[in-house]
Amino acid sequence: SGYKGDNELEDEIANRDPRLYQLIDNNHKPYWIRNSVQTQNPMPDCSASGGVSGYPCTKFHSADEAQYQARNTTYDWFIYRYAEVLLINAEANAELGTCTQAVLDKTINQLRDRVGMAHLTVNPVADQKPINYGYQLSNLLYEIRRERRIELVNEGFRMDDLKRWNAMKVFENPLTVLGIRITPTVEKQYKGIATFGGENGRAVIEYNGKTYLQQYTSKALDDPGLKWTANDRRWLYPLPIDQLTLNKNLTQNPGWDDK
């Protein structure tokens, strides 16, 4: 795959899908316009909900002057995401066994053309380190799911996707707890913004001899809450208390009666 490892952020984004570079790189492209000057993306406050991973997110931000004038350098939120239409079409065809190269060329490969990514074929090479969904998938369906994760990242689709795929096994992967690797370069980038480890620093976690930002401080690598059961209440969200009060015919979803 050409993956260079996680010694530095530069290594992580090298030789990868261009959308990863577009999403988290802040060293080679401007982030927004401020006082008519293109500025780089500051490292995120990794103690806040928007930056728990430690990676700076540049999605939905534009360094175009016209965007700054019109929308204060942010894109409008997608109400109708055409890319999701293309992705779900490809996925449905793959599930039905009707996904041909023509289908891929009309759907996923349209998205890949936008970023200069090589086309997906109906007979992709198997991933050597696949995500463990808890069951086997065809190589094609696996790649379509990965495409969905890449294209729609940070847009609010992931949890619903995992639920409808019955794929909560992915949370048992310890890598889901790990944020950015803490290296001297990262500590320098975060100087004045955050410190890592110690009594007052952001929580870190050791994994395979390396130190990482701990994304979810309430979750250890062996936390039993990472495992979902068939009757886990988290499959459904709790109904709002005010709605239950307004409509006495409504009953709370299973397992949430104490909330």
What does each of the following model-derived ranges do?
Residues 1-259:
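Acidic/polar-rich alpha-helix caps and helix-coil junctions
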